Amino acid sequence: MPPPPPNRREQATAAPSSTDKSETGAGAARKEDNIYIPSYISKQPFYVSGLDNEEGDSLLHQRARQQEEDKAAQAAALLARGKKAGPARTKWVKGACENCGAMGHKKKDCLERPRKFGAKATGKDIQADRIVRDVKLGYEAKRDVYSAYDPKQYMEVVEEYNMLEEARRALQGDQKTPDGEGADGPEDDKSGFKYDEESDMGRDRATTKQSMRIREDTAKYLLNLDSDSAKYNPKKRALVDAGAIADKSAALFAEESFLRASGEAAEFEKAQRYAWEAQERSGDTSLHLQANPTAGEILRKKESEEREAKRRKRAEELANQYGTQPVISDALRETIKESETFVEYDEAGLIKGAPKKVGKSKYLEDVYINNHTSVWGSWWSDFRWGYACCHSFVKNSYCTGEAGIAASEKADAWDK
């Protein structure tokens, strides 16, 4: 009886020897033999140099496991960058940073605070070495935001959501049994989510929007019930005028997407805008135009009056400080006719012969202190500035009046 045929699967999965390795030519990246792969695919071609060279493996693009291992090692290398390689040394060694004492960088590249006397001179407070990896990244890897992401960081997000869930349950007052169910059973615990799934306005949806229409809203095709009123334009997909000419509907709109702004429409628009802006500023929902129109109207008028009072007060202050100029009325401006008077301008663009305007000073004008009747700098004598009212050369001094002038003249005569 002939012997049974050899088990080709066992022979294929058996560990090849060094000679088999050279014969098959799978290279260092070879993981396992597959009898179903033809020899012209599994063997390296003759023009690939080095059977033990990983870079010469022509089947490297089929090694998905090797690529995953390389990506994992690369991610680990990225996460390890910047960490301490071990405990710090107690003595400065040659080649270390002269500022902090760590290896791997020079003094000009050190990110520590510059010391007056570095670690090379003092030998104190030597920092530990940092892990420096030369990671070669491709075009996409350099722009991958999750290349050095640690999945353990997502636990912080999970904990935050758990805290929010606990706060929500505490707010709802869920009383749980030791079995982890609600007070009325397992269905009571999920009663809060039952209506969220059925409705379009769930509490957990980020894009919650009411699709309901208010009771006062009336469709435009119902404003005028005349059979010839609704004129539809198929190109614009809108009603042309809906017959709004002289009936009740004409007071609401004239044409499509056009509201009449006559009457109290402008005041209504201001009140609505004020209510919206007040809610955005303070978050107070009590100022609602439909729910509480009186409070919003009172506050709006109060702020308007305060704003107008501030404007008038500011105008009066400017008028008292700088004066006012006569305003030419419209009727007088119309009576002024154009003239043919010849006007000549100079190089600066100013009218020749016109009186020069005195520029306003940036300092306070006509402010008298310490009983003075003139400002500092109104008197000049002996190359010194002073007050003209008392001839005093001491700034911020108290005014002495005529007695000070007489004393100043007497002192000048005594000096002469």
Curated annotation (Swiss-Prot):
InterPro entries named in the record: Slu7_dom, Splicing_factor_SLU7, Znf_CCHC
Segments of skewed composition (Basic and acidic residues): 168-179, 188-213
Residue ranges covered by zinc fingers (CCHC-type): 95-112
Similarity-based family: Belongs to the SLU7 family.
Main location: nucleus
Protein name: Pre-mRNA-splicing factor slu-7
Source organism of the structure: Neurospora crassa (strain ATCC 24698 / 74-OR23-1A / CBS 708.71 / DSM 1257 / FGSC 987)
UniProt gene name: slu-7
GO cellular component: spliceosomal complex
